[in-house]
């Protein structure tokens, strides 16, 4: 969440800001990198902000070691955003990033998620060699006006199947609820919406 903390100040900088952030990019206690890239920043762009992130190296908790690079353009004023309607479902995708673990674990997680909530765009992603090991299930839904990403992380004494089903069930429940935004996006947009003023 370091990026979200720095972002409001950097939007008011005199010029382009470049950041290199190191630590945990995939941590069960916070939304993963993909959430920032695929859910949070697209919502912020609708408010007039221009920011991009790239994943140099993923860092699974508890070891971390991940690296993210960011570019943030100055923005004199954020525009209000209306998120009362999420619009029609446009696409879904399922990814299972895994590092330094047997690929069979990831494949079991993928299969269980698909059994719970089918999706045509699904794949296992073997991450580059690096510190630590880990696996997670990332299930994304994109709508006309917003997006949601459900994440579930591998943990000791929890089967891969349970992790996969949990991510799929959470997204399935979100889609069925007709809620316009997920709880993580709602939390992270509070400050930008306050800065944008009335209308958000």
Give the residues covered by each predicted segment.
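Short acidic-glycine loop/turn motifs at beta-strand connectors
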Residues: 74-76, 141-146, 195-198
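Short, intrinsically disordered, charge-balanced linker/junction segments flanking boundaries
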Residues: 113, 199-200
């Amino acid at each position: 969440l370091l990026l979200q903390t720095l972002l409001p100040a950097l939007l008011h900088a005199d010029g382009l800001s470049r950041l290199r952030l190191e630590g945990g990019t995939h941590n069960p206690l916070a939304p993963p990198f993909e959430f920032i890239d695929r859910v949070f920043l697209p919502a912020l762009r609708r408010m007039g902000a221009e920011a991009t992130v790239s994943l140099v190296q993923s860092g699974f908790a508890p070891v971390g070691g991940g690296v993210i690079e960011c570019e943030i353009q100055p923005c004199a004023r954020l525009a209000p955003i209306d998120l009362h309607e999420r619009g029609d479902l446009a696409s879904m995708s399922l990814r299972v990033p895994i590092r330094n673990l047997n690929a069979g674990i990831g494949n079991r997680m993928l299969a269980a998620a698909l059994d719970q909530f089918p999706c045509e765009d699904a794949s296992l992603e073997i991450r580059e060699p690096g510190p630590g090991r880990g696996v997670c299930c990332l299930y994304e839904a994109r709508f006309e006006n917003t997006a949601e990403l459900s994440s579930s992380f591998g943990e000791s004494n929890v089967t891969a199947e349970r992790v996969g089903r949990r991510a799929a069930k959470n997204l399935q429940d979100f889609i069925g609820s007709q809620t316009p935004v997920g709880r993580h996006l709602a939390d992270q947009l509070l400050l930008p919406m306050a800065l944008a003023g009335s209308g958000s």
